[in-house]
């Protein structure tokens, strides 16, 4: 079940769904996006717990004429309901199972959102780089150029997600085999992509 932007009880993710979608495995076809919003005030941040939750992409159903909706765009769809005051500065943090794509418009839509909403700062922590998209480097560079801070999730971010967004029933986060090595390798790849201005 997904979190609602409205006030009320917050839904939590099933532990198996979290682990299977955020771990190092390949062949995952869904993108999960956990989000939280903070108001920045004189160098301090104020967490806005009512603006915290998770969502995932909607699969296409061509029989109904529905072409699907990526998780990043679904988040942008709910932003108006968050009623973020343009006179305040906000930091939105995404913990996302795949980095945003280029070919299906996600990076471009996020860039447009950031350009139109200069009171919002975006941090993206991705579990994996979406290199199935041939233009994935362009997507990451576009996000960087739009002012988004893009990083790879490490143990700390996975644990934070587990503690914050998962119905863990009191069980502590158990890192999977290769988590640190995988995060370090992806961080190196991402650093190289973001440092390359031309490609």
Swiss-Prot record:
Domain CMP/dCMP-type deaminase: 27-143
Classification via PROSITE patterns: CYT_DCMP_DEAMINASES_1, CYT_DCMP_DEAMINASES_2
Entry superkingdom: Eukaryota
Outcome after substituting residue 98 to L: Altered deaminase activity and restriction activity towards genetic invaders
Entry's Gene Ontology BP terms: clearance of foreign intracellular DNA; cytidine to uridine editing; defense response to virus; DNA cytosine deamination; innate immune response; negative regulation of single stranded viral RNA replication via double stranded DNA intermediate; negative regulation of viral genome replication; positive regulation of gene expression via chromosomal CpG island demethylation
Residues annotated as binding Zn(2+): 70, 101, 106
GO cellular component, one term: cytoplasm
Reactions catalysed: a 2'-deoxycytidine in single-stranded DNA + H2O + H(+) = a 2'-deoxyuridine in single-stranded DNA + NH4(+)
Effect of residue 72 to Q: Altered deaminase activity and restriction activity towards genetic invaders
Reported effect, residue 128 to A: Altered deaminase activity and restriction activity towards genetic invaders
Cofactors: Zn(2+)
EC number annotated for this UniProt entry: 3.5.4.38
Tissues expressed in: Expressed in peripheral leukocytes with higher expression in CD14-positive phagocytic cells. Highly expressed in keratinocytes and in periphery blood monocytes. Also detected in non-lymphoid tissues including lung and adipose tissues. Found at high levels in colorectal adenocarcinoma, Burkitt's lymphoma and chronic myelogenous leukemia.
Assigned keywords, A-Z: Antiviral defense, Cytoplasm, Hydrolase, Immunity, Innate immunity, Metal-binding, Nucleus, Zinc
Residues forming the catalytic site: 72
EC class of the enzyme, as a word: hydrolase
Upregulation: Up-regulated by interferon and CpG single-stranded DNA (at protein level).
Subcellular localization, as worded in the UniProt entry: Nucleus; Cytoplasm
More about this protein: It is one of seven related genes or pseudogenes found in a cluster, thought to result from gene duplication, on chromosome 22.
Free-text function comment from the UniProt entry: DNA deaminase (cytidine deaminase) with restriction activity against viruses, foreign DNA and mobility of retrotransposons. Exhibits antiviral activity against adeno-associated virus (AAV) and human T-cell leukemia virus type 1 (HTLV-1) and may inhibit the mobility of LTR and non-LTR retrotransposons. Selectively targets single-stranded DNA and can deaminate both methylcytosine and cytosine in foreign DNA. Can induce somatic hypermutation in the nuclear and mitochondrial DNA. May also play a role in the epigenetic regulation of gene expression through the process of active DNA demethylation.
UniProt similarity note: Belongs to the cytidine and deoxycytidylate deaminase family.
Subunit structure: Interacts with AGO2. Interacts with TRIB3 (via N-terminus).
Record's protein name: DNA dC->dU-editing enzyme APOBEC-3A
Native source organism of the sequence: Homo sapiens
């Amino acid at each position: 079940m997904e979190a609602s932007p409205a006030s009320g009880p917050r839904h939590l993710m099933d532990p198996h769904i979290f682990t299977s979608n955020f771990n190092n495995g390949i062949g995952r076809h869904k993108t999960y996006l956990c989000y939280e919003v903070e108001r920045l005030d004189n160098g301090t941040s104020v967490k806005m717990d009512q603006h915290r939750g998770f969502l995932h992409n909607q699969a296409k159903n061509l029989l109904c004429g529905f072409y699907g909706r990526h998780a990043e765009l679904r988040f942008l769809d709910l932003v108006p309901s968050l009623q973020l005051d343009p006179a305040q500065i906000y930091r939105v943090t995404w913990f996302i199972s795949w980095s945003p794509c280029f070919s299906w418009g996600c990076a471009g839509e996020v860039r447009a959102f950031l350009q139109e909403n200069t009171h919002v700062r975006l941090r993206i922590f991705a579990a994996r780089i979406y290199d199935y998209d041939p233009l994935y480097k362009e997507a990451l560079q576009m996000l960087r150029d739009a002012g988004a801070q893009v990083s790879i999730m490490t143990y700390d971010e996975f644990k934070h997600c587990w503690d914050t967004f998962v119905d863990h029933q009191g069980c502590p986060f158990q890192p999977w085999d290769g988590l640190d090595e995988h995060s370090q390798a992806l961080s190196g790849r991402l650093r190289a992509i973001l440092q390359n201005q031309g490609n």
